[in-house]
Amino acid sequence: MALPKGRLGDRMYDLLARIGYGCTEDYNATRKLVVENPAAGIRYFLVKPSDVAIYVEHGAADVGIVGKDILTEASADVYELLDTGLGRCRMCVAAPADYKDDPSRPVRVATKFVNIAKSYYASIGRDIDIIKLNGSIELAPILGLSDVIVDIVETGTTLRENGLRVVTEFMPCLLYTSPSPRDMRRSR
């Protein structure tokens, strides 16, 4: 099973451990990227969240836990099997409090979710210029690099603390388990 490194992967592992699928070594104390419990027949691969779907799609992992945002952005050939009920967030367009859209020019959008942003703005017929960033997305409109951002939002605290507001929410982002189509065909 491919688990995303970080808070959501840790929460999912804790849940799995509580139902008997923990590891023989201390998951939280190791820096190993593969941890297992041979007696339970489970092995966890700890990978970057954006790589979970790739490991599953190519058969290196039978199943993975990944956020809807990552799954959508990656466009991987995997099935969305189950909403785990964890990691409830939403994909949003956010902007400075005083932002006013000017339809006479393309919107400058900063995001790490390029495919999701393009798809959303295409669906509303709006021209955009994408600025690909890998972190601290909220900084872009503050420094005038972009008009708006497209990012995942859980509570909105980071937006508010940086003088930004949600303009629109357009996609829920939940944590999913995702088997590859190849695995689904094998299990039939």
Question: Which positions does each model-derived feature cover?
Answer:
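N-terminal organellar transit peptides
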Residues: E25-V34, V150, R165, E169-M171, ...
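Ligand-binding pocket segment of bilobal, Venus flytrap-like solute-binding proteins
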Residues: R31-E36, A140, D147-R160, L164
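Single conserved hydrophobic/aromatic residue that forms the stacking wall/gate
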Residues: Y176-R188
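Beta->alpha turn/N-cap motifs
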Residues: K48-S50, G59-L71, I152-T157
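Short helices/loops that flank or line small-molecule/ion binding pockets
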Residues: V34-P38, F45-A61, I124, S136-D147
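Translation machinery proteins
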Residues: C23-I42, L46, E57, E73-L82
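Bilobed "Venus flytrap"/periplasmic-binding protein-like clamshell domains
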Residues: A2-V35, R90-P141, L145
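Periplasmic-binding protein-like
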Residues: G85-V93, T158-L159, G163-S178
